[in-house]
């Protein structure tokens, strides 16, 4: 995040490329912590992550100030232009949330509350 905010885009891209080269055919998901970025930075990261060869760009770790939101997922889906996949993670607490993220174009969802959600319980907290 620091290098992105400092405008060191080539360094960020090369770091991701190096990781992708190291993992080879394994799936690489790059977490960008959308809650810490501006919309312009999120768009820039979509370009960088896809150009670097990552398989997924992911909204959050679940350990920062916020998780996935509809605005960010829609922005990311548009930003990747099908070049890589989008994973919405963090803060997903209802079936309706899951359905909306998928309708917006998320390819994968991440939640620690899947059992509660699928059992129809409101999963509380972040």
Which positions does each model-derived feature cover?
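Short hydrophobic "strand-cap" motifs at the C-terminus of beta-strands
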Residues: 89
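Alpha/beta enzyme core
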Residues: 1-86, 94-120, 124-126
